[in-house]
Amino acid sequence: MKRATLFMLAAAAFVAASGRPAAARELAGVNMPETLSVGDKTLRLNGLGLRKKVVFKVYVGGLYLETPSKDAAAILASDQAKAVRMTFLRDVSKSQLKDAFVEGFENNAKEKAAAQRAAIEKLYSLLPDVKETQTMSFSYLPGKGTTISLGENALGLIEGREFAEALFALWLGPKPPSEDLKKGMLG
């Protein structure tokens, strides 16, 4: 009996000392990992926010950076690896996604978007229908470009820093989908 109790205490002490194997932050029932690997870089979760459309919860978005920051302009101007990860809370069609991106480029990066027309058309061609609980990611690596992924599957790569600046402005620009989403992503 004493031996079993001693074993249980030792096991409990080991678990307590080791902590959680993978820390995460939670919002609206979605757990976002504290770190994300993009190429050979490890990015840290800068912040996460909730995208709502009218009264509907659409997705939880997480912003990942090499160097965390609360300054949207500095993040957009920096040529560091970065990613936005969106976990959807409802089904969203390709058409609905495209409409949201069109509006986002119009509101936040109109001039840059005009110069990046071909890259943006490629983005639109890559957008999938997204189901509830699926995760879509946009991961930028300097010198390589932005990889668009659904879950673990890469949908395509769009080269160029200028495209990445226009894309990330959708969430961090002057007119994001919602101020709460932007504030959350900025931590």
Q: What does each model-identified segment do?
A:
Residues 155-181:
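Flexible glycine-rich active-site/ligand-binding loops centered on an Asp-His dyad
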Residues 150-152:
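Short strand-turn-strand beta-turns centered on an Asx-Gly dipeptide
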Residues 14-21:
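C-terminal segment of classical bacterial N-terminal signal peptides
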Residues 23-77, 111:
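N-terminal secretory signal peptides
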Residues 34-36, 145-148:
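Short polybasic amphipathic segments
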Residues 68-143:
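Mid-length scaffold segments of soluble, non-membrane domains
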Residues 1-8:
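Bacterial N-terminal signal peptides that target proteins for export
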